[in-house]
Amino acid sequence: MIQPTHSSRRILLPARGWFIYLSLCAALLLNLIPLGRLPGIPDWVALTLAFWCIHQPLKVGMGAAFFFGLAMDVANASVMGQHALAYVLLAFAAGGLSRRILWFPVVAQALHVLPLLLGTQLVMLMIRLVTGAEFPGLLYFLSSFVAILLWHPLNYLLLLPQYRAIEHDENRPI
């Protein structure tokens, strides 16, 4: 499958389904690391979900977002459906914007992903406030900004298994 980006015109191998869901499970495990209430820790599931919904919108969508959202709700003991709703909206927006976002270089992709991640956090914050929680402060949104700084390494890491080996063949022009 051809992935249009400015930085690379390489033809990528198809993404394997097991690798996609393994990376989402690894992101879920990263979210479960008990780091307390440190500001700036990114939501790894949201970041990885946004990546796969942009790069493989036919393989990862709202169903996977709902499943991993419920898993996060259970893991965090939060209001049931809080993460699920936010992740489904993230998957819908990322899948809808995937063709547009892929035309930009990786740095510009990160800037396009920032409103998606901020929107995800805003949905979760609104649900918390409706259920009676206190406003956590503006540092709550710092994790989205840290996440876009991690977009480039995550992009490289998750696309690495899809890169085709560069081998020159006289009979094959591509």
Regions found by a protein language model. Name each.
Residues 1-174:
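Terminal, non-globular segments
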